[in-house]
């Protein structure tokens, strides 16, 4: 299968080298030029996911890249999504739908089937768009993963596309990363690499130039540009929790998020991290929950196991103390399920079959079922009747008298979530609550912030995507990039 000139792939020398960011930047740059461009990631492993318009599930990075292309997210943009649910196993999602869970060894054998889904999705996108901008995963030089590879060079070879290799200079060793990666590739794979992008550079570019000259002479491949380090660029993290915060002055609301072993969709908290009046703290193992105005129990891929971890760390008692002193508590998705009285997993969907006691803070019980609920929704928060948009990704069905006091009333007539009688505890299945300006402001007032500054998170994300495209224009060889995309340089 040949699609050279219409498909361009970005691979990285390491995880977090800048692949997602570079693909986002290139997508918006091409879209601004009027090119019909679409993002694509063959295989993604992440617990941060988004719901598509066609009712499926893809990695959140591809949803952001879709926004960069000015497109609605679609399952073809990320045909294989792996969501880890144990240290050695993951739920396998094909074309937006969960098909099974398996351990790493079983998935290695399954990759041939997964590759069929990957190539089918790519074929549809390549037929519909002028440029398919592809993001690799991790590094193409992982020797133990080379067999049956579908995420990096295995895919590039299958569709016969050129590759850009990106490396992060800020972590050090950039020349070793680039040259070493090339050395570990096969001859045909090495030939496929058409140039390098160096990411996160700080300082005087003139001091770097001798190294760039050496790299080009050593490899025979061009450096397509050097992107600067941008400290205040805030796009949603693909997997690792982003703990950076915007500069803040004045009184702030203290919000604490316990980081559980299988935390999912922690991008829910990005709007709080960037809010000028919020001091957001992620608390990990071995740490006590600090005093706070609001504690938020996040989503979880393994709710019963994470509930056990919460108890082992003594956080359940800390949460009860927090409530006794007048603090507020919010549970999102799996966090909502933890707030109830019982959690049942009769099918063993998230581990061993069985039931667990919840925190008992809402009169609810949840039963996990095989069918996952995947919806983009609109509605109104019960607090202040604030309008909101969000999305559901969950396998649980929750019942109980607390549902008579819903947290959200959806436009489709359904009620979602619950509130406690005293109003101090609230839970909802909806992710993305804080991205809606009015709902975020209402929740912050509920948690104790009297005068709330309205922040348009969607506008902030759009601004940063535009900034990325500006960086492409200023710092990369756009002529060569257009040639790699099969586009005229005009």
Curated annotation (Swiss-Prot):
InterPro entries: Class_I_gatase-like, CobQ/CobB/MinD/ParA_Nub-bd_dom, CobQ_GATase1, CobQ_N, CobQ_synth, GATase_3, P-loop_NTPase. This is Cobyric acid synthase. NCBIfam families: cobQ, PRK00784.1. The keyword Translocase does not apply. Pfam families: CbiA (PF01656), GATase_3 (PF07685). PANTHER family: COBYRIC ACID SYNTHASE, DETHIOBIOTIN SYNTHETASE. Belongs to the CobB/CobQ family. CobQ subfamily. Catalyzes amidations at positions B, D, E, and G on adenosylcobyrinic A,C-diamide. NH(2) groups are provided by glutamine, and one molecule of ATP is hydrogenolyzed for each amidation. GO terms for molecular function: ABC-type vitamin B12 transporter activity; catalytic activity. It comes from Pseudomonas aeruginosa (strain LESB58). The keyword Secreted does not apply. Pathway: Cofactor biosynthesis; adenosylcobalamin biosynthesis. Transmembrane segments: none annotated. GO terms for biological process: cobalamin biosynthetic process. Signal peptide: none annotated. The active site is at residues 333, 431.
């Amino acid at each position: 299968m040949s699609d050279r000139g219409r498909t361009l792939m970005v691979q990285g020398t390491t995880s977090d080298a800048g692949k997602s960011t570079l693909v986002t930047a290139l997508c918006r740059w091409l879209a601004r030029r009027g090119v019909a461009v679409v993002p694509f990631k063959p295989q993604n492993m992440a617990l941060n996911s988004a719901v598509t318009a066609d009712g499926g599930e893809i990695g959140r990075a591809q949803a952001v890249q879709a926004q960069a292309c000015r497109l609605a997210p679609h399952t073809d943009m990320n045909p294989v999504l792996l969501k880890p649910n144990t240290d050695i196993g993951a739920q396998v999602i094909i074309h937006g739908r969960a098909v099974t869970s398996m351990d790493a060894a079983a998935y290695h054998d399954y990759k041939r089937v997964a590759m069929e889904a990957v190539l089918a999705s790519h074929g549809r996108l390549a037929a519909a768009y002028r440029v398919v901008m592809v993001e690799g995963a991790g590094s193409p030089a992982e020797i133990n993963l080379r067999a049956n590879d579908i995420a990096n060079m295995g895919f590039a070879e299958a569709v016969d596309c050129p590759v850009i290799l990106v490396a992060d200079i800020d972590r050090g060793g950039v020349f070793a990363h680039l040259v070493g990666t090339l050395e570990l590739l096969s001859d045909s794979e090495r030939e496929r690499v058409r140039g390098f992008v160096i990411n996160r550079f700080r300082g005087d570019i003139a001091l770097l130039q001798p190294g760039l000259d050496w790299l080009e002479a050593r490899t025979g491949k061009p450096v397509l540009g050097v992107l600067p380090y941008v400290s205040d660029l805030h796009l949603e993290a693909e997997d690792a929790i982003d703990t950076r915060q915007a500069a803040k002055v004045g009184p702030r609301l203290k919000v604490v998020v316990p980081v559980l072993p299988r935390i999912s969709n922690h991008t829910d908290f990005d709007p709080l991290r960037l809010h000028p009046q919020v001091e957001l703290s992620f608390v990990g193992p071995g740490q006590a929950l600090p005093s706070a105005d609001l504690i938020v129990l996040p989503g979880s891929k393994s709710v019963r196991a994470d509930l056990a971890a919460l108890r082992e760390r003594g956080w359940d008692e800390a949460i009860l103390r927090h409530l006794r002193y007048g603090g507020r508590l919010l549970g999102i998705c799996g966090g909502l399920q933890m707030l109830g009285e019982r959690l049942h997993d009769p099918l063993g969907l998230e581990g061993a079959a069985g039931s667990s006691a919840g925190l008992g803070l809402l009169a609810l019980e949840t039963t996990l079922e095989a069918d996952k609920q995947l919806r983009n929704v609109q509605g109104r928060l019960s607090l202040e009747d604030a309008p909101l948009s969000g999305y559901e990704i969950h396998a649980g069905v929750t019942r109980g008298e607390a549902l008579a006091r819903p947290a959200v009333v959806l436009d489709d007539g359904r009620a979602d979530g619950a509130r406690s009688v005293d109003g101090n505890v609230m839970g909802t299945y909806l992710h993305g609550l804080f991205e809606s300006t009015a709902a975020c402001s209402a929740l912050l007032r509920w948690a104790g912030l009297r005068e709330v500054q309205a922040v348009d998170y969607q506008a902030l994300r759009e601004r940063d995507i535009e900034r990325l495209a500006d960086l492409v224009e200023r710092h990369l060889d756009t002529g060569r990039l257009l040639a790699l995309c099969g586009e005229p340089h005009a």
